[in-house]
């Protein structure tokens, strides 16, 4: 499968899932982006088009962590969950952004659940 086919396939999946997933101020959307070397997660209020909270493997508190392996992703998920709970957010809508729910994406979701987020 060529790179163009992979990109267009992911875009189709992303568009299809975004049609069904929307976040509000009470129940924001947990959006994940996974690159080859890093992982990013943010809570988004789609009704106000604002980012409520963002955490990544490149954040200041994650300087000692190397790369974006499964354990790093689990740590990022825990940090996101803890910060969300501190802001009073307990439930979210999970948006995997066209990525498979496997490996690093699953680890981030599990870390967020460990911190107390419900989705």
Curated annotation (Swiss-Prot):
| Record family assignment | Belongs to the universal ribosomal protein uL18 family.
- Indicate whether rRNA-binding appears among the record's keywords: yes
Transmembrane stretches in the record are none
Q: Does Ribosomal protein appear among the keywords?
A: yes
Q: What does this protein do?
A: This is one of the proteins that bind and probably mediate the attachment of the 5S RNA into the large ribosomal subunit, where it forms part of the central protuberance.
Q: Name one Pfam family in it.
A: Ribosomal_L18p
Q: Which GO terms describe its biological process?
A: translation
- Record-level GO cellular component terms: cytosolic large ribosomal subunit
| Keyword set, alphabetical order | Ribonucleoprotein, Ribosomal protein, RNA-binding, rRNA-binding
Q: What species was this sequence derived from?
A: Chlorobium phaeovibrioides (strain DSM 265 / 1930)
Q: Name one GO molecular function term.
A: structural constituent of ribosome
Quaternary structure annotation from Swiss-Prot or TrEMBL: Part of the 50S ribosomal subunit; part of the 5S rRNA/L5/L18/L25 subcomplex. Contacts the 5S and 23S rRNAs.
Which gene is annotated as encoding this protein in its UniProt record?
A: rplR
This one is known as Large ribosomal subunit protein uL18
